Amino acid sequence: MSEMESDILRAGWEAWRRNPVTAVPFVLHGLSVIAVSIATLLSAIYAIMPELPAAILSGDFGDEAFKQMFGEFLKRCLGNIELLGVTFVFGLVIVAALAALFKAWWIKLCYDALEGKAILSTAFHHAKSLFVPLFKFELILTLLIGIAFIPLINLGLDFFRNIHMLTKEAALYYVISFMIWSAFLGIFAITIQFLFTFVPYAIVIDLKGTLSGIRRGVMVLRHNLVDTIIMWLLVGLAGMALQVAAYPFRFFGFWGTLAGTLVAVILGWVAVMPITTCWWVELYRRRSKTLNSFPNG
């Protein structure tokens, strides 16, 4: 690790330690996404099979009745693909909007923390002014990844339509196809995230528009590939450290695993994500100074 990376890691740690309020947007974002996801899922379930939630909550049916109801639920899902699609897209748009608002907030907050003092209200006011360009970027990102999901969705729908008449060879085909497409999607999503690493920072820190922010972010990446790869590895190690910390809880069964997951999520929101965001902000600040600015667009 070079001296510059060491300085960045130290600066991020000190900024978070002096300004623990940097964790607030991450916590609020996480809770908001969970709430929206649950609300969207329950709305879809209730629209497709209104009697299902009440039946599950009553708990007055056995395994066989549950299997029958679940089978009926799958049939109704296949008959309401359009409704599920609209609900899913609506949920994605809401999540993208939340990501844009909170991401602008925490980037500005971490930037201010590195400067010396982070104030929630000041950073939030700045975030609101940049919501539109960052929201457009989040929609572009969501659209790119969403389009890549279409073959996998079609594969899953085809599987459920033919589930009662599948041969062993056909089942093996679906399993292999699913694994291949899942691997492709994972690689594609990681590649897109990597290429657009610095775009949110360009929009929030340099006050760029959506397109000029994309150009600026890609340019910073192109001139700093090695540093970016190293930073991604360091961020990945920080995430792995959370998993290691939560691993001992697994020895206590289901509830222990659940508690360990909860601890890892909370530590991620409160410490790891603010610190690693400070790292990215500091890296962007240092590396973008040498580049010519693009006009807003």
From Swiss-Prot:
InterPro entries: DUF7847. It is a multi-pass membrane protein. It comes from the Archaea. The chain crosses the membrane at residues 26-48, 80-102, 134-156, 185-205, 225-247, 262-284. Its main location: membrane. It is found in: Cell membrane. GO terms for cellular component: plasma membrane. Keywords: Cell membrane, Membrane, Transmembrane, Transmembrane helix. This is Uncharacterized protein AF_0863. Pfam families: DUF7847. It comes from Archaeoglobus fulgidus (strain ATCC 49558 / DSM 4304 / JCM 9628 / NBRC 100126 / VC-16).
